[in-house]
């Protein structure tokens, strides 16, 4: 059986003999953070590694709203129009099955593109553009078939986590009477942003804990990204609004 490019690259990466080889591999996997500039680059590295998952909401708008509206397709609401005991919809019209699955697919495709562009890129010399499959192996649970399907499954899983976090935030907002009404924002920026970010990083910590995106050196930058998520989310929403993918800039 022909060895995949990722397997060959990983075998070569870890093939050095003895302690010198081990230290060399560890050095290549380290994320320098001696200066403020290094830390800023690591924050950008985290943003790029997790960017496909963060963009799941854009994919959800594409598959759940723009495409159905453009081609006259009917989307299917996740809550089926059901009303909670508080008199509000469980989730609302903004949460559809097409958006949920489409968001995951969008993220999966973006991780495949990232792997294609940055395959083999290491932290020691290529930050912030790191291969998301840098230390992945065929024995990993998400490696189904080959490296490309592995990249897709990784992205799809984190994108789905993003969408589930967004749904959780929406559910809580509606229970608190903070649901969005037409052009009026829900006035709950933290519930609009933090749940999906937390779900993404929790999913990564549980399901991809041995991957480069969960390297211990990236823990402080990950915390920084969570804190910055409201600003990042707002920026993506404005971009989606200007591209015509969203009807409102929030």
Residue ranges and their predicted role:
Residues 7, 13-202, 212-250:
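Interhelical loop and helix-boundary elements at the membrane-water interface
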């Amino acid at each position: 059986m022909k060895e995949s490019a990722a397997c060959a690259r990983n075998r070569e990466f870890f093939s050095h003999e003895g302690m010198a080889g081990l230290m060399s591999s560890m050095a290549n996997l380290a994320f320098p953070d001696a200066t403020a500039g290094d830390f800023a680059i690591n924050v950008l590295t985290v943003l790029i590694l997790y960017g496909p998952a963060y963009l799941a909401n854009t994919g959800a708008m594409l598959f759940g709203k723009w495409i159905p509206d453009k081609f006259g397709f009917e989307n299917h609401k996740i809550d089926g129009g059901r009303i909670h005991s508080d008199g509000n919809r469980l989730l609302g019209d903004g949460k559809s099955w097409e958006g949920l699955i489409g968001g995951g697919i969008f993220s999966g495709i973006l991780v495949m593109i990232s792997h294609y562009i940055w395959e083999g890129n290491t932290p020691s010399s290529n930050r912030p553009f790191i291969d998301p499959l840098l230390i992945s192996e065929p024995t990993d649970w998400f490696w189904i078939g080959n490296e490309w399907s592995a990249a897709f499954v990784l992205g799809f899983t984190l994108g789905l986590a993003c969408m589930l976090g967004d749904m959780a935030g929406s559910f809580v907002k509606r229970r608190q009477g903070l649901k969005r009404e037409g052009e009026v924002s829900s006035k709950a920026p933290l519930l609009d942003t933090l749940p999906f970010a937390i779900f993404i990083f929790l999913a990564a910590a549980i399901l991809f804990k041995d991957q480069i995106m969960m390297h211990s050196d990236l823990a402080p930058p990950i915390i920084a990204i969570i804190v910055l998520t409201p600003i990042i989310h707002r920026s993506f929403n404005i971009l989606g609004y200007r591209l015509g993918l969203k009807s409102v800039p929030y």
